[in-house]
Design a protein with these regions (language model features):
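Conserved alpha-helix/loop element of class I SAM-dependent methyltransferases that forms part
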Residues: 96-115
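Conserved class I S-adenosyl-L-methionine
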Residues: 113-124
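Conserved SAM-binding loop of SAM-dependent methyltransferases across substrates and taxa
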Residues: 125-135
Length: 186
């Protein structure tokens, strides 16, 4: 299915299980894209871009093995949303506390050892990665080009791009022990 908006593609199947039976749950019509904060609206195309928001459910009616994931039908060009991102995790005490809790909880479960690779996708300013022990191999993927990364002596390897498994395999010999992806689904 094609959109009138060249910045949008549409799901053809469930992102998790591949089911093509997607049932519309909620249609919010066209909305301005989020995270578009600019100095002036004059001659700025980003302030005019809208995208429809349609929630669809991976239907389990015809097959109980389907996953039932609730997801957006429309896929907005990621660069419009993330290349110039305004939010910084470190500026908010609540966010810093929550990210520290994520690290504490995941390390209680997984128990990484010195040298283990830890990846944070959408790592923002690396606040989360800085809560890990410096003996770990810390890797951040962040597509925003306007974010200054915080590296508190942890030697974090930053890729200014979206996560890419081929790029990861080219740069690292071992699988990651922990992969986090906070705030990627809202």
């Amino acid at each position: 299915m094609l959109s009138k908006n060249k910045n949008i593609t549409y799901l053809k199947e469930c992102k998790i299980c591949g089911n093509t039976n997607l049932k519309e749950v909620l249609q919010l019509n066209e909305q301005y894209i989020s995270a578009t904060f600019v100095k002036s609206n004059v001659d700025n195309n980003l302030t005019e871009i809208k995208t429809p928001l349609t929630l669809v459910l991976c239907s389990r009616e015809d097959n109980s093995n389907n996953c039932g994931l609730l997801q957006l039908l429309e896929i907005t060009e990621p660069d419009l949303l993330y290349r110039q991102y305004f939010y910084r995790s470190a500026t908010n005490d609540t966010m810093r506390t929550d990210l520290k809790d994520v690290v504490e909880n995941v390390t209680k479960i997984v128990k990484p050892q010195s040298g283990d690779i830890i990846i944070d996708t959408g790592s923002n300013d690396c606040t989360l990665l800085n809560f890990y022990d410096k003996q770990l191999s810390l890797v951040g993927y962040e597509p925003a080009k306007n974010i200054k990364y915080i590296d508190e002596g942890k030697n974090i390897k930053i890729f200014s791009d979206y996560f890419n498994s081929d790029q990861f395999k080219k740069n690292f010999k071992h699988k990651a022990k922990i992969i986090t992806s906070c705030a990627m689904f809202y």
